């Protein structure tokens, strides 16, 4: 499972940033469920791309974080993921559904 704490470009336009307490809760759920996870960032600063709807949900006051399977070369002719990452992502979503 890969967590992305913040997204956006051009300053704060169309961006979101998970607060420390929400990040801590997400990490705690993963630790309690013995799920392996990592954090990442979404591409280069101010380059755009990497679309997400998290910022829209954040506009309504929701705590948001982007999460998913780590992918190498997304949108390329051959995207690559690890079977272990896919398995841990499934376990992470289950842990979150049961404990959050």
Q: What is the predicted role of each segment?
A:
Residues 69-100:
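His/Asp/Glu-rich mid-to-C-terminal helical/loop segments that flank catalytic regions of hydrolases
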């Amino acid at each position: 499972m890969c967590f992305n704490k913040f997204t956006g470009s051009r300053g704060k336009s169309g961006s979101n940033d998970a607060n420390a307490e929400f990040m801590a809760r997400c990490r705690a759920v993963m630790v309690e469920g013995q799920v392996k996870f990592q954090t990442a960032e979404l591409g280069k600063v101010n380059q755009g791309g990497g679309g997400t709807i998290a910022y829209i949900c954040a506009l309504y006051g929701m705590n948001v974080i982007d999460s998913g399977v780590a992918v190498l070369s997304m949108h390329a002719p051959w995207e690559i993921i690890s079977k272990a990452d896919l398995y841990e992502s499934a376990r992470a979503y289950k842990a979150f559904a049961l404990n959050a």
